[in-house]
Amino acid sequence: MTVDINNIVGGSMIKSIKSVDFRYSGRVEKNYTVENEILNYWNELRKKTNFLHESNILTVSNMTCINDNYSIELKDTTFSHFMYSKKNQLGLICMFSGAYIVTSDNYIVCVLNNYYSNEETFQILNLIGGISDHCDIINGQYSSENCLKREFKEELGIDLDQTCFQTNLKFIKCPSEDEKTFTCEIGMIYEIKSLFTKDELTKLFKSSKHDDEVTDLIFFSKKNYRNVYEFSHVKPLIPELLEKIYSEKCIQINKVIVKNR
């Protein structure tokens, strides 16, 4: 797959976004040999983990940007293909929706979740959210918000359609200079404003029914956000995101235009 990364890659991973135009263009083509290699790798991988599940995911086959206006072409493939590509550094780029929560008492919420990489399973500091799925294609159009709502329900047991949550698209995560030749992720990053306090949100998470991917909520404030650098495992975008939020004081509503075709 080829992604047009002119004016996109390099410098900051967390970039401003004015509009995004999604285009769904079918399925990634793979030959018989690659299909067999993927299947064999996946069968071995499933013996090592119990939280990875096969699904049809969406990948970025092309992306362009002009003045913070993005055009993204999507194709679907299997999650096993993505993991195989990740292991072999084949450059497959998946699409994701992710979010942080802003509580009513002004904490920013990320999560600890189970993660598998480089033949190891561990917990990592991450956004809430996950890889976009074929089920997020609705009437032939990709819905990033549908992906986000689905992931919130699965990971936290929280329904984002409740009136106590307000969803705003804030940023786009693009490949860094180091990532551009490897399997990586491109995604929409949302800010979720909540009427719940830190303690209320913690109680809601503990009492809700959800999967076992997310193990804990992690709260940051203006005073302690640099504690992010003390975590053993953290998604590279998280420190940059927190620095951007707190340095620019950008906890506010942005209106981003989302198009589908």
Each model region followed by its residue ranges:
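N-terminal leader/linker segments that precede catalytic domains of diphosphate-processing enzymes
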Residues: 1-125, 131-150, 157-261
